[in-house]
Curated annotation (Swiss-Prot):
InterPro entries: Tetraspanin/Peripherin (IPR018499)
Membrane topology (UniProt): Multi-pass membrane protein
Extracellular side: 42-65, 112-200
UniProt KW keywords: Glycoprotein, Membrane, Transmembrane, Transmembrane helix
Transmembrane portions of the chain: 21-41, 66-86, 91-111, 201-221
Residues exposed to the Cytoplasmic side: 1-20, 87-90, 222-230
Family indicated by similarity: Belongs to the tetraspanin (TM4SF) family.
Positions glycosylated per UniProt: 133, 138, 163, 179
Domain of life: Eukaryota
Organism: Dictyostelium discoideum
Stated name of the protein: Probable tetraspanin tspD
Any one annotated GO CC term: membrane
């Protein structure tokens, strides 16, 4: 394999630096996506605080968005370090960079896979069960906050039989707002789109990261063979 590598490290480190710049930008995208998801899914923490929520809802409201945000920040730091060690041809630094990127790749695949799993699962049914349990309890104020945030009224048509409009947002004249806009449609669409975005971003970044890892490994081999590392 080694004989097919470029004769000088330059032809390996330049693509590696370019890939790290691309990954830095994608890391910034992850931070933005993570920030949006933290703000959005934090609304479901109120369901968690009043008790009785499933593990799926706990995961998408806390661990998943926080994980995406953390990975994005770590990605940005690591890719800057990758550019530096590649430019200076520091073999030890490249080894640590490769190990950390490999760990990050595994975590990224895990979070991306988790997001796509929840996207394909019927998470709406689990939200519905918790929603309706809370609607008719002494914690119904949580539903009022969620309906105000999502600009909807009643979870679905079946709620209309149970006078769900009593919890719907109202204007200054006590008129019901968003009547006919059911929360199931709004929430299910918003949750699914964000989960799909996280999963797709994880897969796309994982592919580019894998290519970057290959260039880093080839550069390590070339530096070792040429004894040019310091």
């Amino acid at each position: 394999m080694v004989e097919y590598l470029p004769s000088t490290p330059r032809y390996l480190k330049v693509p590696l630096i370019i890939l790290n710049v691309i990954l830095w930008l994608l890391g910034l995208v992850l931070v933005i996506i993570g920030g949006i998801c933290v703000g959005f899914f934090s609304r479901f923490k109120e369901l968690q605080e009043v008790g009785g929520v499933s593990e799926s809802i706990k995961s998408i409201s806390v661990s998943l968005p926080a994980g995406v945000l953390s990975i994005g920040i770590f990605f940005m730091v690591l890719t800057v370090a990758g550019c530096i060690v590649a430019y200076k041809e520091k073999m030890v630094g490249l080894v640590f960079y490769t190990i950390l990127m490999l760990v990050l790749l595994v975590v990224l695949i895990g979070i991306g896979g988790e997001a796509l799993t929840y996207h394909n699962a019927d998470i709406g049914i689990e939200i519905e069960d918790n929603w309706k349990n809370i609607s008719y309890s002494n914690q119904s104020v949580v539903i009022k906050k969620l309906e105000q945030f999502f600009e909807c009224c009643c979870f679905d048509e079946s709620d209309l039989k149970l006078n769900c409009t009593a919890l719907c947002p109202q204007d200054d004249q006590k008129n019901i707002l968003y009547n006919g806009t059911f929360c199931y449609d709004v929430i299910f669409g918003a949750v699914n789109s964000k989960l799909y975005l996280v999963g797709s971003a994880g897969v796309a970044i994982g592919v580019i990261e894998l290519v970057s890892l290959m260039f880093a490994l080839f550069l390590i081999v070339r530096l070792y063979k040429s004894n040019s590392y310091r």
